[in-house]
Design a protein with these regions (language model features):
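C-terminal regions of proteins
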Residues: 268-349, 581-607
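Secreted/periplasmic serine-hydrolase-like ester/acetyl group-modifying domain
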Residues: 137-247, 331-351
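N-terminal pre-catalytic segment of deacetylase/amide-hydrolase enzymes
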Residues: 350-419, 588-596, 605, 609
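Membrane/wall-proximal cationic-aromatic binding patches
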Residues: 30-93, 100-110, 397, 402-409
Length: 609
């Protein structure tokens, strides 16, 4: 082959390979740079580059929104739905990786000039003074060229058309392993723009010791010396955003999100004071940066990102809601006239004591009462009364799950020594034997009834006799007393294999091995919906608590039940619960002590202390 032909073949080969690479990147579009027209998987694209992918998403959906939230990654916890309700608006959260106020300015300008914008919420985080106008990665940290006048059209398209093919191939491979819940490759909720925290927000939270086991970063927090060299430039961009909003008639609200107390120690006090002092000279703002919330690690996902529950507190404080517990020192409206002492004290948040934000709640688990005790799930009426009497004489007060929710969500007080008494399955003995004893001592209790066994003494669709279960009339009488609540133990996800004829037996609430996620979610939804309708129809009381059969569950179980309005779930693991104000996760998979005939009154008291 002549040299000319060799060169020609080489050039043609290069062009063909380049065309194939461009076609692959255009079709897969792993950054959403071209609008992701084929796969339309923006939660994946936004994980690679939220700046570019969210722009592409809004180009197709901006008519669904009229308000926006801007800021670094911690801004994700600013709750879109809560602000929608408070403002009567449709917010989209434009959080991005990194804290770059220059990018916020460019995005705000594009939004105001091209979309309908009624409200803009800007989160100014401390790190906005640490970096500025920094494109650390041309694929993952840059803006769309339409938002960034410093990026040419040619530069933008060539970098994405000829990007490393491994990005596109990774997206195609992820399609095969995608699940209902978020994974590391699709961490965003494309509808809201926020991080998809369904998994993190479903995890049970309890004592500080348990939290440190799950999040060791808080046990040995990494410190480093940091400065804020770009405070002036940051404030110039904030001022530019303010001017843009004023000229366009956009309602601008500025907030400074919570910073974990240990992270604040990375900076010199005067450096931080100057940052917030400078912000106050530019615009009034809601300051949440340093408070008792900053001192409580359980309010943070990690060392820099506060939980969505804290975001709800932010929204409530900013909009004047009073139906949510908020620490008194959380959220100050700061202006140019705020006294100098305020900025000097920003590094001195006072932690709330454990007694101020949490309480210890033991939960007891019973099943069946009988004069003839033949197994570990039975307790005699005499022993049960002795146990209840011991609780009463020791100063314990039976509380309901409604009271626990009121404590966590609204900060309503609990008795000094609360205890929760529960019964699983809904046996008739709960009505004939336990209920009179509970009445005698004024002790509240919750009974978790199996729907398919409600009011029957035979196993479903068979002639097999079972221990009798109470029905609607008894349930109505007990709940009318104010002492008893009837809640769900599922409708038919606590099956007994010897009495089942099908091949797939649901002994518990877990997904069957042969079942897809979608089929499982549908089955669980139908089961709980049926259980709730049955029990609410019998008692007229809301059903929003579920005890897991055999204590077994998965993250998908918990997430699905939360979406159905279940606010409390219970396991069968032993231990005393640490219930924390502002953290509904402390009501998930709650611990319970299984109480048997062998537990003496003295042993019971020792167990729960």
């Amino acid at each position: 082959m002549s040299s000319k032909k060799w060169v020609l073949v080489f050039l043609v080969t290069v062009l063909v390979l380049a065309a194939l690479l461009a076609a692959l990147n255009l079709a897969a579009d792993p950054f959403g740079a071209f609008g992701d027209r084929l796969l339309s998987w923006f939660s994946y694209d936004e994980t690679n580059n939220p700046r570019v992918a969210k722009f592409s998403y809004l180009e197709q959906h901006h008519d669904e929104y009229d308000s926006y939230i801007l800021g670094c990654s911690s801004t994700s916890s600013f709750p879109v739905d809560a602000f929608n309700e408070a403002y009567g608006a449709s917010f989209y959260n434009l959080i991005m990786y990194g804290a770059d106020m220059r990018d916020c300015e460019k995005i705000a300008r594009y939004l105001i000039e091209h979309y309908e914008v009624k409200n803009l919420i800007l989160n100014v985080y401390l790190d906005n003074g640490l970096t500025y106008d920094e494109e650390s990665d041309r694929l993952t940290k840059n803006l769309h060229y339409k938002e960034d006048p410093d990026t040419s059209v040619l530069s933008y398209y060539t970098r994405y058309l000829f990007a490393d093919p491994r990005y596109a191939l990774a997206k195609l491979n992820a399609l095969r392993t995608d699940t209902i819940l978020p994974q590391t490759f699709d961490v965003f909720d494309e509808r809201t723009g926020c991080y998809d925290k369904r998994v993190r927000d479903a995890e049970p939270i309890g004592s500080e010791e348990r939290y440190l086991e799950s999040y060791p970063v808080f046990a040995d927090y990494p410190h480093q010396t940091l400065s804020l060299p770009y405070t002036e430039q940051c404030m110039q961009s904030v001022a530019a955003i303010k001017t843009l909003c004023e000229e366009a008639g956009v309602n601008l609200t500025v907030a400074a999100g919570p910073v974990y107390a240990e992270y604040l120690k990375n900076y010199e006090p005067e450096t931080i004071a100057q940052f917030y002092r400078s912000l106050a000279q530019v615009t009034p703002f809601w300051d949440f940066s340093s408070s008792s919330v900053s001192c409580e690690m359980r309010y943070f996902y990690d060392g820099t990102h506060f939980r969505n529950n804290v975001g709800e507190m932010i929204s409530a404080r900013m909009t004047g809601r009073t139906d949510l517990w908020i620490p008194d020192d959380f959220g100050t409206y700061v202006t140019a006239d705020t006294p100098e002492d305020y900025f000097l004290n920003v590094l001195s948040p006072a932690a709330l004591s454990a007694d101020e934000i949490s309480t210890q709640v033991p939960i007891l688990m019973y099943h069946h009462l009988s004069e003839d005790v033949t197994n570990s799930e039975m307790v005699s009426p005499e022993q049960f009364e002795a146990q209840i009497r011991a609780l009463s004489e020791a100063g314990y007060t039976g509380v309901s799950f409604d009271e626990l929710q009121a404590y966590v969500l609204r900060g309503e007080p609990l008795p000094e020594k609360p205890v929760v008494i529960t019964f699983d399955d809904g046996y008739r003995s709960n009505y004939t034997l336990a209920y009179p004893i509970l009445q005698k001592y004024g002790m509240k209790a919750t009974i978790f009834a199996i729907g398919v066994s409600f009011g029957t003494d035979h196993y479903k669709d068979t002639d097999y006799a079972i221990t009798p279960h109470f029905g609607a009339a008894e349930a109505a009488e007990m709940t009318a007393s104010g002492l008893i609540s009837i809640q769900s133990h599922t409708y038919d996800m606590h099956q007994w294999p010897p009495y089942e004829t099908g091949s797939a037996v649901r002994e518990n609430i877990l997904q069957l091995s042969s079942e897809s996620e979608e089929a499982y979610v549908q089955a669980l939804t139908e089961d709980f919906t049926r259980s709730r309708a049955l029990l609410e129809g019998a008692t007229g009381q809301p059903v929003d608590v579920l005890a897991y059969p055999a204590g077994q569950y998965s993250t998908l179980t918990q997430v699905t039940l939360q979406s159905l309005g279940v606010h409390v779930t219970l396991s069968t693991n032993p231990g005393v619960n640490t219930v924390v104000k502002g953290l509904p996760q402390t009501l998930y998979a709650m611990l319970r002590f299984g109480i048997t005939e062998d537990v003496s009154p003295e042993a019971l008291l020792n167990m729960i202390q």
